[in-house]
């Protein structure tokens, strides 16, 4: 596993794309970001549309090595699910763990989503390990 303080490389061409995604985020991304930004989540610093390697993660906390992905309808096909699985495996090789939520979960049950993230962070704090 990589040191949590290590720098995670990203392809420089992704910087502009990530900025564009931040400027044109979905409603689900907006409402989750309102709960994560400014270290509101237990003092952890989350970033949105974070370039890592050759990909962009919806939300990322370096200290927790936690990626949060919001899956919209484009992720429902078997081909998309396989692509997401392979992508997640690549990130897990860097020691990054994932939480995935659907857009519907974010829109319809945001409190539960926040609780899942808090529980994940609590477990990390208590054990020093990622789930």
Please report, for each region that a protein language model flagged, where it lies by residue.
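Solvent-exposed, charged helical/coil patches
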Residues: 1-43, 123-131
């Amino acid at each position: 596993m990589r040191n949590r303080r290590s720098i995670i490389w990203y392809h420089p061409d992704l910087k502009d794309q990530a900025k564009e995604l931040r400027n044109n985020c979905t409603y689900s991304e907006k409402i989750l970001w309102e709960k994560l930004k400014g270290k509101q989540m237990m003092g952890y610093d989350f970033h949105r549309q974070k370039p890592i390697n050759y990909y962009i993660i919806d939300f990322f906390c370096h200290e927790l090595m936690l990626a949060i992905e919001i899956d919209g309808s484009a992720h429902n096909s078997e081909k998309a699910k396989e692509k997401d699985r392979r992508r997640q495996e690549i990130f897990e090789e860097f020691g990054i763990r994932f939480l995935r939520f659907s857009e519907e979960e974010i829109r319809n049950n945001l409190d539960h989503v926040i609780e899942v993230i808090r529980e994940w962070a609590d477990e990390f704090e208590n054990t020093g390990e990622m789930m």
